[in-house]
Amino acid sequence: GKSRHTKDYIEKRGKIQISNELKDRPEEANNRSRLGDWEGDTVAGATGKACLVTYVDRKSRFLKCMKIAKKKSDLVKEATIQLLKEEPLCTITPDRGKEFTAHPDITEELNQVQFYFPLPRHPWDRGTNENTNGLLREYFPKGKDLTDIPEEYIQEKVDELNKRPRKCLGYKTPYEVYYSETLHLI
């Protein structure tokens, strides 16, 4: 079975340097009043194999996703830069996973975007992303090896999710909300 640690166990694999706490995140990000506040995470496939890097815009629920070969911080960094470099960008709220240790490099690369980290083991602080990852799991069940799944198929499923009406958006799709807003920004 899975090995577990006692409650006194201290993690020895290094600590992630936290740049900002979630409580310091701007109010506009907290109340979803603007585009460009992203929540990030990784969706693991089979253990040690390929995974998905996901970012969800808090206001529109618009999903950006990319497959990477392994859950490594340098690969997550490259995927993040590629996914978000053309998008409106105000804040990023990832989880506290070791895969986000390269966040200072991402900040430098993406116009000084600030990262806001939630408390450890508080996934509900990034509920938008966790919910969307749950929707992604309809297509990519837990433990499924993502290595042989083509990027085109993944993007097809991401597009399906972005074009699915959501009750919280007044039955508009994330795509409609995101692109009607970004067109106003131009």
In which residue ranges do the predicted regions lie?
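Mobile-element integrase/transposase regions
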Residues: G1-L52
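Mobile genetic element proteins and their domesticated derivatives, centered on retroelements
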Residues: D41, Y55, R61, T80, ...
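Active-site beta-loop-alpha junctions of metal-dependent nucleic acid enzymes
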Residues: G45-G48, C65-E86
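Coil-to-beta-strand transition motifs
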Residues: G48-A50, R58-L63
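Short, well-ordered secondary-structure micro-motifs
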Residues: A50, A102-D105, T128
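Short, surface-exposed connector motifs at secondary-structure boundaries
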Residues: S60-K64, L84-C90, Y139-F140
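Acidic/histidine-rich, metal-coordinating catalytic segments
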Residues: E87-A102, P120-R121
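Charged alpha-helix within mobile-element recombinases
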Residues: T107-L110, Q114-F115, L119-I186
